[in-house]
């Protein structure tokens, strides 16, 4: 299920059209941006200003050297920036600092990691985000013949529509917890109607910015979920953790205690991001299909109906491996009787059957969403882990309590109780994705016999060199880490 057939690859040359040594320009830009970020970091986290300036400049230099060829657009640069910011925090604040302070025994201690939570927010917002966007803007100005054309109108319309849909869903939870009057206070009107208007406007703006940033990176419905999830996490840091208190005239509070109090908003932003990503991908595919796509020569070797049936079948078959692995976790934690409650029973055997049916449905959805996303088995496992994480947020924290007649349980208590299920969801996603790509590749072997069809198949797959690795690091890292730290 591809969104576009263009190849998205980094430039094949390092040469800038105007400057003989192109690396000098991004290095200067990133050092300057890193120094500014270091100054802001010093002011917010209250550490030594000279040290922050030097470290910010060094980080900007390293980021420019490593990512100047990969940050081919502002969106790609942003994802690389977020991934490297999390990596920096893991190495420095979660690795080196604990060892220096208390020795090797301090590594991985939750209390120590919680104490470093303000630095995590600062690294993401003050270093990763600005460095990524600035370097991506520079990269987007370079001439790359193989890069897909950008449509400003398509990005705004599709993104705005996605923001409307995501905002409507997120707004249901916000209305339940009475947050609209709080947003209405930003325009001096503490009413539900004014808060709803502010929320809707912000959702549309975020959706439109998603389209502007990531139009060239969104190739399939599955990967769009990942990009949307990453953008939702970023906006949780940026919105309720930062912009909202500043607009209300309150000091910034990036402590883990404040983050824990906003855990419901964290899950809500993830769900919002998932809906924005998927809705944008659908809208973008429809736009391209109706107004852009025309390729009478390079026809698909199979019709859309056959491709859909194959994807559903492979997904259902692959889910058997993931579902059986997940059932081991459920058996160990005694979760099968709770699953049986979905159909009015309590038997572990009934729960196992219901679990396999749900696994097959999710596996079929994986087949529809993620076909042609992975160029190799390693990439397939990464997408599978991400999809398993997606269903941990959508399943036990969102849909399961609703199906039992309850309400959303976006609380740290519910997340803590569901942590064993998180392990099971990750195992399920990885095993299902690995089995799926094996089945998919076995079927596609006959296509590779024709050089023309083989070349088209390669062109339709996500190429190596996109920001996907940084996306996996950022989403999987924070998607697993934050429920533990904030719980």
Language model: regions and residue ranges:
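Juxtamembrane/disordered regions of integral membrane proteins
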Residues: 2-487
């Amino acid at each position: 299920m591809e969104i576009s057939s263009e190849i998205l690859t980094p430039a094949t040359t390092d040469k800038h059209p105007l400057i003989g040594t192109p690396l000098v320009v991004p290095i200067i830009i990133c050092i300057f941006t890193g120094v500014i970020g270091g100054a802001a970091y010093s002011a917010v986290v209250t550490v030594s200003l000279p040290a922050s300036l030097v470290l910010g400049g060094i980080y900007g230099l390293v980021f420019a050297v490593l990512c100047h060829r990969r940050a081919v657009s502002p969106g790609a640069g942003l994802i690389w920036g977020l991934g490297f910011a999390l990596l920096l925090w893991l190495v420095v604040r979660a690795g080196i600092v604990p060892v220096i302070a208390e020795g090797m025994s301090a590594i991985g201690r939750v209390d120590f990691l919680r104490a470093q939570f303000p630095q995590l927010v600062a690294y993401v917002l003050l270093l990763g985000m600005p460095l990524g966007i600035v370097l991506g803007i520079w990269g987007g100005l370079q001439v790359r013949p193989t890069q897909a054309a950008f449509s400003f109108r398509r990005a705004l319309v599709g993104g705005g529509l996605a923001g409307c849909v995501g905002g409507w869903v997120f707004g249901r939870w916000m209305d339940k917890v009475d947050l609209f009057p709080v947003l209405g206070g930003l325009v001096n009107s503490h009413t539900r109607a004014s808060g709803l208007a502010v929320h809707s406007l912000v959702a549309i703006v975020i959706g439109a910015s998603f389209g502007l940033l990531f139009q060239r990176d969104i190739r399939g419905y599955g990967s769009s979920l990942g990009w949307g999830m990453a953008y939702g996490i970023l906006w949780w840091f940026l919105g309720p953790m930062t912009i909202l208190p500043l607009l209300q005239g309150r000091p910034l509070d990036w402590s883990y205690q404040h983050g824990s109090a906003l855990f419901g908003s964290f899950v809500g932003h993830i769900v919002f991001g998932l809906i924005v990503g998927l809705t944008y991908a659908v809208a973008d595919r429809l736009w391209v299909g109706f107004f852009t796509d025309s390729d009478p020569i390079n026809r698909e070797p199979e019709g859309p109906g056959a491709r859909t049936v194959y994807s559903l079948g492979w997904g259902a078959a692959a889910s058997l491996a993931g579902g059986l692995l997940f059932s081991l976790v459920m058996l160990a934690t005694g979760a099968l009787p709770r699953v049986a409650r979905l159909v009015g029973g309590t038997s572990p055997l009934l729960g196992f059957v219901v679990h396999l049916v749900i696994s097959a449905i999710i596996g079929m959805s994986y087949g529809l969403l993620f076909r042609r996303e992975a160029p190799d088995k390693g990439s397939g496992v990464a997408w599978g882990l991400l999809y398993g994480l997606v269903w941990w947020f959508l399943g036990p924290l969102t849909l399961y309590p609703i199906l039992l007649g309850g309400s959303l349980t976006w609380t740290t208590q519910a997340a803590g109780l569901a942590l064993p299920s998180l392990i099971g969801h990750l195992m399920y996603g990885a095993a299902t994705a690995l089995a799926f790509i094996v089945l998919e590749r076995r079927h596609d072997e006959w296509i590779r016999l024709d050089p023309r069809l083989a070349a088209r198949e390669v062109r339709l797959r996500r190429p190596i060199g996109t920001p996907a690795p940084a996306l996996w690091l950022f989403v999987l890292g924070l998607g697993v880490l934050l429920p533990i730290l904030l719980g």
